From Swiss-Prot:
One of its GO terms (molecular function) is translation elongation factor activity. The gene is ef1b. It comes from the Archaea. Disulfide bonds: none annotated. This is Elongation factor 1-beta. InterPro entries: eEF-1beta-like_sf, EF1B_bsu/dsu_GNE, Transl_elong_EF1B/ribsomal_bS6, Transl_elong_EF1B_B_arc. SMART domains: EF1_GNE (SM00888).
């Protein structure tokens, strides 16, 4: 099987969401889903809002990134999470 690298774009619910706490929650969630977190970055968006990008490495399997994406969307302070890049290594 191949290794999959995915970039997930995560939007917090508001600018008041504590950035470092959200990043730590995302890292833990990735590792709980049998994947490796290869980095978490944030970029300013507008009016204090920011976007978080999570790089995920995992073995290719049926369902792919769907379980991780769904789990991220279920987090309390996450407005949306979507895979924006996906590649095989």
């Amino acid at each position: 099987m191949a290794t999959v690298i995915a970039k997930v774009k995560v939007m917090p619910t508001s600018p008041e969401v504590e950035k470092e706490s959200l990043k730590e929650s995302l890292k833990e969630l990735v590792e709980q889903n049998d994947a490796k977190c290869r980095g978490v970055t944030d970029e300013p968006l507008a009016f204090g809002l920011y976007t978080v990008y999570v790089m995920v490495e995992m073995e290719e399997k049926e369902g792919g990134m769907d379980p991780i994406e769904e789990a991220m969307n279920a987090l309390e302070n996450v407005e949306s999470a979507e895979v924006v890049e996906l590649s095989l290594v």
